[in-house]
Amino acid sequence: MTSYTSSILSQISSPEDLKKLSCSELSLLAEQIRHKIISVLIKTGGHLASNLGIIELTIALHYVFSSPEDKFIFDVGHQTYTHKLLTGRNIEEFERIRHDGGLSGFTSPLESAHDLFFSGHAGNALSLALGMAKATEKSRTHVLPILGDAAFSCGLTFEALNNIHTDLSKFIVILNDNNMSISKNVGVMSKSLSQWIHHPKFSLLSRKLERSLSKIPRYGKSIAKCSHKISTCLRSLVCPIPIFEQFNLAYMGPVDGHDIKALVSLFQKVRDLPFPILIHVCTKKGKGLEIAQENPTKYHGVKANFKLTAEDKLLPTIQPQLTYPDIFGKTVCKLGEISPNLHVVTPAMSLGSRLETFKGTFPERFIDVGIAEGHAVTFSAGIAKANTPVICSIYSTFLHRAMDNVFHDVCLQNLPVIFGIDRAGLAYGDGCSHHGIYDLSFLRAMPNMIICQPRSSIVFQQLLQSSLHWQRPSAIRYPNIPALQGDPIATDINLYRDPGLGEILSQGEDVLIVGLGHMCSAALSIKLQLLSHGISATVVDPIFIKPFDNNLFSILLMHHSKVIIIEEHSIRGGLASEFNDFLATYNFKVDVLHFGIPDSIFSHGDKENLLQRVGLDVDSMVKRILTYFNFRTKKAPSNKLSIV
């Protein structure tokens, strides 16, 4: 990597500092930012390829426009590392990005006035920008939504496009195209025609001409429409994307997204045009790092503690333990062999949910619908209606976007769609927009729905296999953490063929501890610590949140008056809410202590510290248990821990 003796980056404390630089200095700044991003992400992890691809574009935008007076709205927001470096963030906080004490990996209004929204989900930037443009249309404010090409697989983006009006000024859509295949234009005539037709003056003159023609008595509107069609046809000769013109956006481009001089020149020309514009910018993901540029999907996001070897390959320092997504991917592949008609649907999460092997083995039965969660759910419902088994693999945080589809198209029809809900629980480095801690709140209310969560890899595999027999909508939620490879008890697969049965992991006398999914491990650790205080606990895994095992808990509450619920979910609407409904229905009077995610917004952080912040680390829970129940240390029971 290049060594810089005089850092321009260190002199940038706000976007205004950019305006003092020459074009050559802006290019040097881009290389310094690229060097900084690579060197930091090797240590911290984060979104690599997308941030390397948008550096020059971000610099040019901040050079021409004036944030925060002008409004930059980044779709998704994971590609904003350059934006952060140019808008006065603390460089030490950037070097800890996505970790405790560091910057968010997405835009965050808590960090800067230059960040307008908390971000993390795709497809909403255009709607947000249109709202802001409407509210500020009488001011001098420019509104610039910056969208990746993936945003155009979202229905919400097209809903917003359909609402754009021709009289909307200072509204400039930036399409950051790092994936579309644009046919190359051939020949001098084509190049000249393209430069003329896509020049801002051509757009301005054609719009003025159409308005003037429309004022001609009687035939004006017809003549204006004809003029618009001629203009559109001329554009379509050299541009394969005339669709934007149909949505009242004057199309300009494509332009090289790594040519700062060309970008600055174009932005300066279009800045004050009195109609909405879309600028098509072509960039390369992973720009400046060969391995990331060659495989942008693999290097879209990298984990912490990666290192660059002399061979320019990113290698993990240690062999990681299998995670729940790893187990999911492997098990689904096995089920694909057992069930020759099994289909798998995902909304652009094939790599994250470890479905690449299934995709390669059964390509005709694997469907990636793009960032279109609602369609993924309803499409899966259509497959299920045709008596074909289907798994819809989706992140918990993205399932929110398809709530109506889950109700209307799956549960109301009682179709056996199996939802593999990935990233259930805290998202750690990804932060508040990605925490999977709300899905139980709405899934519990869905008619016909089965909901469960495994405590170990063994139970996970057995639940997935059993779900093919349930013949009802089902949701198996799981976190993105190393999976418990063993299991506290020998599990019989037939136990899960009839959903709704919980399991006793360990018996005691003084208190009942109920742990959901991977929190069973925390429950067993708490049991051991309580034993040192002479307190004996029963530990139970409900496995199924819905249907709830009323019979098992009715028996257990005959012998326990103190209950502890532990779940990595919001305290509103999760396992504890289901348990409280059970208590009210059967009129049990017991003392309940609930550990869950408080009803607040929690940002990013490392696993250990974030668990401490929400009160879900074992030591904090033990202290609170002893205080809450006023337990006093007594002589530990002589009998050893019994496992049944």
UniProtKB/Swiss-Prot annotation:
The keyword Magnesium applies. GO terms for molecular function: 1-deoxy-D-xylulose-5-phosphate synthase activity; magnesium ion binding; thiamine pyrophosphate binding. One of its GO terms (biological process) is thiamine biosynthetic process. It catalyses: D-glyceraldehyde 3-phosphate + pyruvate + H(+) = 1-deoxy-D-xylulose 5-phosphate + CO2. It holds the Pfam family Transketolase_C. InterPro entries: Dxylulose-5-P_synthase, THDP-binding, Transketo_C/PFOR_II, Transketolase-like_Pyr-bd, Transketolase_C, Transketolase_CS. Mg(2+) binds at D149, N178. Keywords: Isoprene biosynthesis, Magnesium, Metal-binding, Thiamine biosynthesis, Thiamine pyrophosphate, Transferase. Binds 1 Mg(2+) ion per subunit. Thiamine diphosphate binds at H78, G120, H121, A122, A150, A151, N178, E373. GO terms for cellular component: cytosol. It is an enzyme of class 2 (transferase). Its cofactor is Mg(2+); thiamine diphosphate. Pathway: Metabolic intermediate biosynthesis; 1-deoxy-D-xylulose 5-phosphate biosynthesis; 1-deoxy-D-xylulose 5-phosphate from D-glyceraldehyde 3-phosphate and pyruvate: step 1/1. Its EC number is 2.2.1.7. HAMAP family: DXP_synth. Catalyzes the acyloin condensation reaction between C atoms 2 and 3 of pyruvate and glyceraldehyde 3-phosphate to yield 1-deoxy-D-xylulose-5-phosphate (DXP). Homodimer. Belongs to the transketolase family. DXPS subfamily. This is 1-deoxy-D-xylulose-5-phosphate synthase. It comes from Chlamydia abortus (strain DSM 27085 / S26/3) (Chlamydophila abortus). The lineage of its organism: Bacteria, Pseudomonadati, Chlamydiota, Chlamydiia, Chlamydiales.
